[in-house]
Structures are given as C-alpha cells and as structure tokens.
C-alpha cells in the first residue's frame, strides 16, 4: 500500500531564480527561504538532512562562504531585453490568467504581466517581512493575504 500523498502550494517573493536558485551565492539570500521551507515540510515525511549542511548552506551559520536566508535582500529582474521584446507578441489568454476574470478577449499582449494569485492562496510570511521592511507591495497580492510560516 502506498503512503498518503499531499501537497501545499505556498507563494514566495521573487522571480524564478529567486525561488529555485541559479544566482551566485552572494545573491542567494532570497532563495534560501523556500529551500528552508521545503526542508521543514519534508522532514516529517522521512527525508533526512545533515544538520551541519543545512546550518552552513541554507542558514549561513558557519560564517564561511554561504549567505544566510534573508527576506529583505534585493530581488532580481528576469526580464532581459530579448524577453521584453517577446512580451509585445500577442498570445492567447492562459486559462489560469487573471485576465480570464471578466475578459472577453482571447488575445492579449503579455507586457510583463504578474501572475494571478488567488484570494485563498497561502503566502509565505517572508513576503510580509519584505513588505514591512521596504516599499515592496506587489499589486497582485490578495487584499487580505493568508500568511503562513
């Protein structure tokens, strides 16, 4: 018999590389937040982690070459010049787009649209920390966000 499976979708601040990694270590304070969250969430399922490795690489506690997680570090802009040009090419409105809500047009210009975040979405508490510490105020954040640790 297979084990029960479940998942939880939690939203974090940043572009793809700010969430999944790929930037140099010195610019990786934001990516450590979802990584720490995934480690915390998967431990109860039996995944094992070396505490020293997590403390060094994720939490930056060793004082070595790894930066600690930080909700207030600058986020990246993944819209390169080439990508921005592509944003002016008309395309179909995706089914999960906020544009589907009340839109009658099947075609639109992306123009760097932000993702639609549902009202009942779980938003990581680090987004609130970023908002409280700076002028960060994403227009697609629900009016009454549900923040989770």
Predicted features, each with a name:
Residues 1-149:
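Active-site- or binding-pocket-proximal scaffold segments within functional domains
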């Amino acid at each position: 018999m297979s084990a029960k499976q479940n998942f939880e979708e939690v939203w974090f601040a940043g572009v793809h590389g700010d969430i999944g990694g790929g930037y140099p270590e010195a610019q990786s304070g934001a990516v450590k937040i979802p990584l720490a969250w995934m480690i915390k969430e998967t431990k109860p399922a039996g995944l094992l982690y070396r505490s020293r490795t997590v403390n060094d690489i994720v939490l930056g506690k060793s004082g070595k070459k790894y930066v600690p997680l930080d909700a207030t570090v600058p986020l990246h802009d993944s819209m390169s010049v080439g990508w921005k040009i592509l944003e002016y090419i008309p395309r179909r409105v995706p089914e999960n787009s906020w544009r589907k809500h009340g839109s009658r047009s099947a075609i639109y210009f992306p123009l760097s649209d932000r993702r639609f975040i549902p009202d009942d979405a779980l938003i990581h508490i680090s987004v609130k920390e970023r908002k409280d510490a700076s002028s960060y105020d994403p227009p697609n954040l629900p009016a009454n966000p549900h923040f989770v640790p």
